[in-house]
């Protein structure tokens, strides 16, 4: 029963913090350090379940955008590219943002998962990225749609996504911040951030799923897989819905202050 409750909690934490700009890896690392919550104990299959759950959350929430983009991409292959068409341009912008993140993640993920997994790294990045939120809110024009970005800007946001391999940075936080600095409206920066997360999550999940299927799952692993998947999917969907609605009306300052408070609390606990 205790393991089942931990699986529920880990799935909920993953779904919530994957899409809110507070760092999912940072919160999971802190949960492991202070509460003994360790998703590794459930094996690779549980990690795959969390990835697939958050992927389902993105796909379901943005299903109309993704269908339009997929259709536009197919048309570009059969009829030629027309990057003045918004859906086609957005599809290629997401592709341009995905490539650098995928390459860096593939080549350097093991390094980031071992060399920088320290609570003090999380403390620093929570505070530093919170400061970047305030800067982006102060200087960003917040007037453009995602489809109006240039491809160099999309690649830059892709590099920001790769930086989130470091615990405490936050994938959504880094990409949304850079989107604001590039002049995107808050809800557009969030929309682009979540859309570009889909191929990255799908790629990582697919690679891991192959290993899981090759190894097979016992009854207990299958139960934990189902629990992790459902919790991360449901909570992830609700987190996306909340955040898109929130940033349409409010700034990121509340999340910056949350990051500052959490960084201060964790630093105090580490020093005790």
Swiss-Prot record:
GO biological process: cell wall organization; peptidoglycan biosynthetic process; regulation of cell shape; response to antibiotic
EC number of the protein: 3.6.1.27
TM ranges: 42-62, 92-112, 120-140, 149-169, 194-214, 224-244, 252-272
UniProt topology in membrane: Multi-pass membrane protein
Recorded catalytic activity of this chain's protein: di-trans,octa-cis-undecaprenyl diphosphate + H2O = di-trans,octa-cis-undecaprenyl phosphate + phosphate + H(+)
Keywords: Antibiotic resistance, Cell membrane, Cell shape, Cell wall biogenesis/degradation, Hydrolase, Membrane, Peptidoglycan synthesis, Transmembrane, Transmembrane helix
Broadest EC class assigned to this enzyme: hydrolase
Entry's Gene Ontology molecular function annotations: undecaprenyl-diphosphatase activity
Gene Ontology CC terms, in alphabetical order: plasma membrane
Claim: Transit peptide is one of the keywords in the record: no
Chief location: membrane
Domain of life of the native organism: Bacteria
Cellular localization per UniProt: Cell membrane
Cited InterPro entries: UppP
HAMAP family, per database record: Undec_diphosphatase (MF_01006)
Annotated family: Belongs to the UppP family.
More info: Bacitracin is thought to be involved in the inhibition of peptidoglycan synthesis by sequestering undecaprenyl diphosphate, thereby reducing the pool of lipid carrier available.
Function: Catalyzes the dephosphorylation of undecaprenyl diphosphate (UPP). Confers resistance to bacitracin.
Protein name: Undecaprenyl-diphosphatase
Organism, as annotated: Rubrobacter xylanophilus (strain DSM 9941 / JCM 11954 / NBRC 16129 / PRD-1)
Gene, per the UniProt record: uppP
